[in-house]
């Protein structure tokens, strides 16, 4: 058996050592202590009092260092030199020790720890261990009634319990890498070590072993109907529980006295073998453990940490042990769930201090689930490593004043838990302990003697010195710089960026397919498919109106299917969805009007513009022109994304208003005059054989055409429908011909109902109803459920609401054009070179639209693991543009709104999360399968016409509205699990717009509001709103032809903002431009270098693991330079004590 044995370092538990620690001397250095002591030197009776009943130790004192070296009166000058050496160190010994322990970052992460605390319960002459609390991330307690678990909550610990825990680890038995596989063997080894160190009398071996091997009763689900005997037994157990309130003291005393009398003989007769035979713990997990549903909350490959605390009457001093097994082992029924145990903490103490023992147990249990301390516990080499871990934990502790907070209030788990990476990587005192939400705090403000030195009354004075630190607005930590990936580095080689994109994406190509085989992909396919066909039909119809059906719905369907599937198959970022966009539609309309007004053939002219634009895109790819995207900051992203979102919202509402115009409501309807309302078809005044639509049928079930009729006089005009009447030249006569109130109102119900239901189902994921998987399923398929619901409602009412029109035959919309556009023959020769100029405008539009969307998709907060491919994406957009121009299909570019929706539908979260912990955002399921299937389904949708024609158009308008609103909120992405360091620089446009309507006291606690004046934030937002208004006006007027140039102008406007705002302000509300980043980085490097030189010349910080409380008033010329340190210290200890 290989055991790393640790000496206790301190003898038996008595209080004489404690009294010797405070020698009577008038002028002495500050005393190094481990428990809070009175600040005033005149109250020496308190210094000699009984503090905890546990052994007190010196903080900052190593076991191999004599006590007199720091506190003895005869230490002399060497003591002062030693103190100055400690003070001059800018990092604490605990920090250096932890850096040595956790220095290797390339090691595999340690398993997640499930911690369970059991308390010893007495019931007459019987004893058992009862589960009282458990931890994965947050604490869950067994409620007083014992029937249920409490809600997960943040553990609130008393500072005293942490100090006593530190003492326990210093004085108790610590066994690291113990090679034992069962609980009896572990207990034997622990007891043997205690006897060997003189911490336990040999005659108590069997008694301690008997107690530790009692049965463990876990909090399991009990039946609703229980017998009266069971209820009475539980009540009596509750009354006699040693962990209850002080009012239960007498019954506890009687039970323990009775237990002593009944079992004293048994304890004396037990031998080693008998103690093993009296083991009540099963060696293998029982059925209840295996069927425990709580296992779903525990991550895979987790290990357990068991905490056993209790009081017994035969011990005079506490029995303390901390054990780490060399290999985790199943200890049978010790743990609630079948998880192997790696750590064991035992605390048995004399009777009368059950509450103190429970608090110590809660303290060690909370520490074991702390990310940093758990790593220390796994890698600790000796006792001092564990104590250093506690010291670091205390560095981060925040104390709540007892008069301002009720400790009985359970703190709800935060929605976002700060990462422990910063604590693991940074142990410098200058970057520790950001209190009360201060971000990037600098050093503490110069405090007085009371504030910095802690000479004030109770802890509050100590906190004032460090809390009033200098804001990071002056010289403190700035938000993360605008990171530019290697994809946007200018190579200087011909097609250099494209070649690098291909090299980066080629290794990921196979995984792009098998990563898509997941049930989440099904919901994403259905969602994006409905959005794509809605977009194709809507923009196809608008293109047909704008180009006299040279491009219609059929061309839109086929072009979307062909361009989208090829792009998803070969592009650099397959999560981007290609579609027709509003800017492209505007340009197409202007181009058709120009061609028609100048007698040019529209399709041929468009072909040459498309070819020139494709060549220009390839030139941009060859010269690595995409590197200018690094100048696209959040200012440009927010402006462009907001504009596209507004276009979606505007078009959806405009379509709905159009339904009210086409199916108007009779506002003057009077029920009393209902008999006067009628509408009939009247024959035209002059009837001849000239028909308006010769192929139209006479009636819905009549196939005969009007060519078979000799004249129209034989028609019964009153039997014709509205459409037929108008087609044949008839007139509608009556006062109710224009009013169809049911269709307009029903269309609005379908429109708003689809939007509202989709939004509600999306939010249902964060509700408290139903299990997590059910809520996730409902949220993923919210669009599908909403469409099916309101299609069913429409079918039930049977109203003739406008339905989706899908062509059922694959042929061009105009019969006078084919599927190939000839490049020559219809326009003058000068048109071919002259088309370069409009092609340049198209190229600017394509480049900006494509690359801004790519920047939004490739944001760092989306946590994409596979490389982006800006050059490769633009290459394929150019190729597809030339192909679509030859076939007479619409041009396609990245659709911002649908791409954001695609990202949102493929987000991944942790499958298991600790109770009370929000699911962590893991990233996006990066693959090509969903996009390819979506566009294939779009192409074959022409064969699904019988099904798709049942979908009402108002339902699709509701989907459009949801996509616009969701993308408007999607601009604020980064709230779902991204690191706090990223959150500091996120300044959503919409959130800043809301600040105009909020009083300062009600404004959210955004990080940028702490560092940038509100008037500067408002000015920045007004500039964005002005740019957005200019873009909207240009889009809606005849000046829309320069719309692409104005999008490029957003980058110029952002460049000019450098002359209005400081780089500090822009770093918090936007991003710093690349050349400015370099200057800021150089300045920061110089500042750090200067600060480092200053630290070498003058000490800045004391070690945080040493508490210095001067026992005499601080004089104007203090010894050892303590006064200077008190004014400069910014250690987190000044906040805590």
Curated annotation (Swiss-Prot):
Spans within the Cytoplasmic topological domain: 1-521, 588-606, 763-773, 848-866, 909-928, 972-1016, 1058-1137
Compositionally biased tracts (Gly residues): 438-471
SUPFAM superfamilies assigned to the protein according to its UniProt record, in alphabetical order: Phoshotransferase/anion transport protein
InterPro entries: Band3_cytoplasmic_dom (IPR013769), HCO3_transpt-like_TM_dom (IPR011531), HCO3_transpt_euk (IPR003020), Na/HCO3_transpt (IPR003024), PTrfase/Anion_transptr (IPR016152)
Region (Disordered) residue spans: 1-52, 64-94, 221-255, 438-478, 1079-1137
PANTHER family recorded: ANION EXCHANGE PROTEIN, ELECTROGENIC SODIUM BICARBONATE COTRANSPORTER 4
Biased composition (Basic and acidic residues): 1-29
Pfam families: Band_3_cyto, HCO3_cotransp
One Gene Ontology biological process: regulation of gene expression
Protein name according to UniProt: Electrogenic sodium bicarbonate cotransporter 4
Family: Belongs to the anion exchanger (TC 2.A.31) family.
Expression tissues: Highest expression observed in liver, spleen and testis; moderate expression in the choroid plexus, hippocampus, cerebrum and cerebellum of brain, and in kidney cortex and kidney medulla. Also observed in heart, pancreas, muscle, lung, placenta, stomach and small intestine. Weakest expression seen in peripheral blood lymphocytes, colon, duodenum, jejunum, ileum and skeletal muscle.
Reaction catalyzed: 2 hydrogencarbonate(out) + Na(+)(out) = 2 hydrogencarbonate(in) + Na(+)(in); 3 hydrogencarbonate(out) + Na(+)(out) = 3 hydrogencarbonate(in) + Na(+)(in)
Species name: Homo sapiens (Human)
UniProt keyword S-adenosyl-L-methionine present: no
Gene Ontology CC: one annotated term: basolateral plasma membrane
Example of a GO MF term: monoatomic anion transmembrane transporter activity
Membrane topology, as annotated: Multi-pass membrane protein
Activity control: Activity is inhibited by 4,4'-di-isothiocyanatostilbene-2,2'-disulfonic acid (DIDS - an inhibitor of several anion channels and transporters).
Swiss-Prot/TrEMBL keywords: Anion exchange, Cell membrane, Ion transport, Membrane, Sodium, Sodium transport, Transmembrane, Transmembrane helix, Transport
Regions crossing the membrane: 522-544, 556-587, 607-628, 743-762, 774-795, 829-847, 867-883, 889-908, 929-948, 954-971, 1017-1034, 1040-1057
Polar residues: compositionally biased ranges: 65-91
Extracellular side: 545-555, 629-742, 796-828, 884-888, 949-953, 1035-1039
Xref: Gene3D superfamilies: Helical hairpin bin (1.10.287.570), Mannitol-specific EII, Chain A (3.40.930.10)
General function of this protein: Mediates sodium- and bicarbonate-dependent electrogenic sodium bicarbonate cotransport, with a Na(+):HCO3(-) stoichiometry varying from 1:2 to 1:3.
């Amino acid at each position: 058996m290989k055991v790393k044995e640790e000496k206790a370092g301190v003898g038996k538990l008595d209080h004489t050592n404690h009294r010797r620690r405070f020698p009577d001397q008038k002028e002495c250095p500050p005393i190094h202590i481990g428990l809070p002591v009175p600040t005033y030197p005149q109250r020496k009776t308190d210094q000699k009092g009984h503090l905890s009943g546990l052994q007190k130790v010196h903080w900052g004192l190593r076991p191999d260092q004599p006590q007199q070296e720091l506190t003895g009166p005869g230490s002399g000058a060497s003591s002062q030199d030693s103190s100055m050496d400690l003070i001059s160190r800018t990092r604490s010994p605990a920090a250096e020790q932890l850096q040595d322990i956790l220095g290797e970052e390339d090691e595999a992460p340690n398993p997640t720890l499930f911690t369970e605390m059991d308390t010893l319960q007495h019931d007459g002459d019987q004893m058992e261990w009862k589960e009282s609390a458990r931890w994965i991330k947050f604490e869950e307690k067994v409620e007083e009634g014992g029937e249920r678990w409490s809600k997960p909550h943040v553990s609130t610990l008393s500072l005293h319990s942490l100090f006593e825990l530190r003492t326990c680890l210093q004085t108790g038995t610590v066994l690291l890498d113990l090679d034992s596989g069962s609980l009896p063997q572990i207990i034997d080894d622990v007891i043997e070590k205690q006897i060997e160190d003189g911490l336990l009398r040999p005659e108590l071996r069997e008694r301690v072993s008997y107690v530790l091997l009692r049965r463990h009763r876990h909090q399991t689900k009990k039946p609703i109907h229980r017998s009266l005997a069971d209820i009475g037994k539980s009540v009596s157990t509750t009354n006699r529980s040693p962990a209850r309130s002080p009012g239960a003291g007498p019954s506890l005393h009687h039970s323990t006295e009775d237990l002593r009398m009944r079992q004293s003989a048994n304890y004396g007769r037990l031998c080693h073998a008998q103690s093993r035979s009296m083991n009540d713990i099963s060696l293998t997990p029982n059925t209840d453990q295996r069927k425990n549903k709580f296992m779903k909350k525990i991550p895979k490959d987790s290990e357990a940490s068991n905490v056993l605390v209790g009081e017994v009457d035969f011990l005079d001093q506490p029995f303390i042990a901390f054990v780490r097994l060399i290999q985790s082992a199943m200890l049978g029924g010790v743990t609630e769930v079948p998880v192997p145990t790696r750590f064991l903490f035992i605390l048995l103490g004399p009777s009368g201090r059950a509450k103190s023992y429970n608090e110590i147990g809660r303290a060690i249990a909370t520490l074991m689930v702390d990310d940093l301390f758990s790593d220390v516990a796994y890698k600790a080499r000796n006792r001092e490593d564990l104590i250093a871990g506690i010291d670091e934990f205390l560095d981060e502790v925040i104390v709540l004043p007892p008069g301002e907070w009720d400790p009985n209030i359970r703190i709800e788990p935060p929605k976002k838990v700060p990462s422990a990476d910063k604590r693991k990587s940074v142990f410098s005192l200058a970057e520790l302990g950001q209190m009360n939400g201060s971000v990037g705090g600098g050093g503490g403000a110069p405090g007085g003697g009371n504030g910095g030195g802690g000479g004030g009354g109770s802890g509050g004075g100590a906190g004032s010195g460090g809390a009033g630190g200098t804001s990071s607005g002056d010289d403190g930590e700035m938000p993360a710089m605008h990171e530019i990936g290697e994809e946007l580095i200018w190579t200087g080689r011909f097609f250099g960026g494209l070649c690098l994109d291909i090299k980066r994406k080629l290794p990921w190509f196979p995984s792009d397919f098998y990563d898509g085989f997941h049930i989440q992909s099904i919901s994403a396919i259905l969602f994006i498919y409905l959005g794509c066909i809605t977009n194709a039909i809507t923009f196809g119809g608008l293109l047909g109106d704008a180009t006299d059906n040279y491009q219609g719905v059929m061309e839109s369907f086929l072009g979307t299917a062909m361009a989208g599937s090829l792009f998803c198959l070969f592009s650099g970022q397959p999560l981007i969805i290609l579609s027709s966009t509003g800017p492209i539609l505007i340009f197409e309309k202007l181009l058709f009007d120009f061609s028609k007004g100048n007698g040019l053939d529209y399709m041929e002219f468009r072909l040459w513009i498309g070819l020139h634009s494709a060549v220009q895109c390839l030139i941009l790819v060859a010269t690595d022109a995409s590197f200018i995207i690094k100048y696209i900051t959040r200012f440009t992203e927010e402006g462009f994304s907001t504009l596209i979102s507004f276009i979606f919202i505007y078009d959806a509402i405009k379509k709905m208003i159009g339904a009210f115009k086409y199916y108007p409501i009779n506002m003057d309807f009077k029920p009393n005059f209902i008999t006067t309302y009628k509408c009939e078809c009247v024959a035209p005044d002059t009837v001849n054989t000239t028909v308006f639509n010769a192929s139209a049928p006479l009636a819905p079930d009549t196939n005969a055409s009007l060519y078979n009729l000799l004249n129209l006089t034989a028609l019964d005009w009153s039997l014709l429908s509205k459409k037929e009447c108008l087609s044949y030249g008839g007139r509608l006569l009556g006062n109710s011909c224009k009013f169809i109130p049911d269709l307009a109102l029903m269309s609005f119900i379908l429109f708003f109902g689809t939007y509202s239901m989709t939004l509600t189902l999306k939010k249902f994921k964060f509700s408290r109803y139903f299990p997590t998987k059910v809520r996730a399923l409902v949220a993923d398929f919210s669009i599908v459920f909403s469409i099916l619901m309101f299609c069913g409602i429409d079918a039930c009412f049977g109203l003739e609401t406008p339905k989706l029109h899908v062509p059922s035959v694959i042929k061009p919309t105009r019969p006078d054009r084919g599927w190939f556009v000839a490049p020559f023959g219809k326009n003058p020769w000068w048109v071919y070179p002259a088309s370069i100029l409009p092609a340049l405008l198209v190229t600017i539009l394509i480049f900006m639209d494509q690359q801004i969307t790519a920047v939004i998709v490739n944001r760092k907060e989306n946590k994409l693991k596979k490389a982006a491919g800006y050059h490769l994406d633009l290459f394929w957009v150019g190729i597809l543009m030339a192909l679509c121009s030859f076939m007479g299909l619409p041009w396609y570019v990245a659709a911002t709104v649908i791409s954001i929706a695609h990202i949102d539908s493929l987000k991944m979260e942790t499958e298991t999360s600790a109770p009370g912990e929000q699911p962590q955002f893991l990233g996006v399921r990066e693959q090509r399968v969903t996009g390819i299937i979506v566009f294939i389904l779009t192409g074959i949708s022409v064969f699904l016409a019988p099904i798709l024609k049942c979908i009402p158009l108002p339902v699709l308008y509701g989907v459009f509205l949801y996509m616009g609103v969701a993308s408007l909120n999607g601009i604020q992405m980064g709230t779902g699990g991204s690191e706090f360091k990223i959150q500091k620089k996120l300044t959503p446009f919409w959130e800043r717009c809301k600040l105009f309507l909020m009083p300062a006291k009600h404004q959210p606690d955004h990080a940028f509001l702490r560092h940038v004046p509100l008037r500067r934030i408002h000015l920045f937002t007004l500039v964005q709103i002005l740019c957005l208004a200019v873009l909207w006006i240009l889009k809606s007027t005849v000046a829309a032809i320069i719309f692409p140039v104005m999008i490029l102008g957003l980058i110029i406007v952002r460049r000019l903002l450098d002359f209005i705002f400081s780089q500090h302000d822009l770093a918090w509300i936007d991003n710093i431009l690349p050349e400015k980043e370099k200057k800021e980085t150089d300045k920061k490097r110089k500042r750090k270098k200067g600060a480092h030189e200053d630290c070498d010349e003058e000490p800045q910080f004391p070690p945080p693991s040493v508490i210095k409380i001067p026992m005499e008033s601080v004089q104007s010329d203090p010894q050892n330079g303590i006064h200077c340190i008190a004014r400069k210290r910014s250690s987190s200890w000044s906040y805590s004590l």
